[in-house]
Amino acid sequence: MTGRVGNPKDHAVVIGASIAGLCAARVLSDFYSTVTVFERDELPEAPANRATVPQDRHLHMLMARGAQEFDSLFPGLLHDMVAAGVPMLENRPDCIYLGAAGHVLGTGHTLRKEFTAYVPSRPHLEWQLRRRVLQLSNVQIVRRLVTEPQFERRQQRVVGVLLDSPGSGQDREREEFIAADLVVDAAGRGTRLPVWLTQWGYRRPAEDTVDIGISYASHQFRIPDGLIAEKVVVAGASHDQSLGLGMLCYEDGTWVLTTFGVADAKPPPTFDEMRALADKLLPARFTAALAQAQPIGCPAFHAFPASRWRRYDKLERFPRGIVPFGDAVASFNPTFGQGMTMTSLQAGHLRRALKARNSAMKGDLAAELNRATAKTTYPVWMMNAIGDISFHHATAEPLPRWWRPAGSLFDQFLGAAETDPVLAEWFLRRFSLLDSLYMVPSVPIIGRAIAHNLRLWLKEQRERRQPVTTRRSP
């Protein structure tokens, strides 16, 4: 291998220029003299789809909590996105149509509390973040493939990364070594860190999984302005309907229609068939608008077999000099739209862990980050898993016995939220991770849901007891 580059005590390396990698680089820039992000893909200078990010062709939005966290990390981001035409969802009743688990929530009113979310396309959001990172004087993004981190057995730490030299193939002697004080693995779901750990003499992390079997099919389209007032339209899959869809309006006036199937159900592959599914799942005003839609380009397809949480927080030993980040730790059911928000929360954990280490001049950075990440991952993972098991025919490992009964109770809550705007707003805020990461209603909220469902039940009983009058024939 070729010689060392850089001072290992003042250099951080990030593997991958995904949204997670860009967030990590932004945090690291405040603690290291030099930050290098290595990305195998050629990065576009303007918003554009990337071959190594197949999910960027499908429905994306920035939840309210995620918007707050991203704007804190990248000041001015939200202002610039709106200036570029990114739709902003506010407290108005005409912004969102939300169908969840077979229930259409009563969101057709002005929300009592502030709620602001944004609808950038994934390529636009990545471009906004990337250009901000590139403006940092101590950060560079380099197009190179990291073959693996370099582990020093005597020190029991990662001391840098090995880069694949063009045309080197399997020639390890031609790999280039880049020294680093810290390596952040933001390589996404395809991370090889569990394999590297076993090669270095450490245990592989246990994995919690939810086998959901999601398949996507998406198509962009245009419609005349004003046909649809809402900027977000969602009809989620349910226990009795394994197909769902979402429609979003993006920054350039283009819409995307994403259809998906759970439990290995296949979504419709053509735009006409997607519209036919919309006819089945959405009110007539949406399908009338789709009848005037002009499709753009070709459909895009993607698969997401399982949600996965690598439990680095449970490892007793972990090498120094490397930390996992983003989807390399936990990847969530993308139909819930919470993955980017969870990454932004982890960026905050990374910042606090680095501050704590600098203040104490010691400490285990990886252990602190892994513990903090687990604390915020657990409630969202649990909420996702209960929903998938209860409504999407998923299987999970491990599977606590109380998850299915909890899902049944929450189904009743969603039923009440169809016509109770207070319950609908509570769900929308918790689902957006605003007020709490835990989807656990307070006693007053539970009482409101019970009272609401009881009134509906009593009304049904009265209607059943009413005598049916029939007219006698002359």
From Swiss-Prot:
Q: Which InterPro entries match?
A: FAD/NAD-bd_sf
Which interval of the chain is the signal sequence? none
Top-level taxon of origin = Bacteria
> One GO molecular function term?
iron ion binding
A single GO BP term for this record reads: thiazole biosynthetic process
| A GO CC annotation given for this chain | cytosol
Propeptide residues are: 1-4
Alphabetical list of PANTHER family matching this protein: THIAMINE THIAZOLE SYNTHASE
Protein name (record) = Protein Rv3254
* Organism (species): Mycobacterium tuberculosis (strain ATCC 25618 / H37Rv)
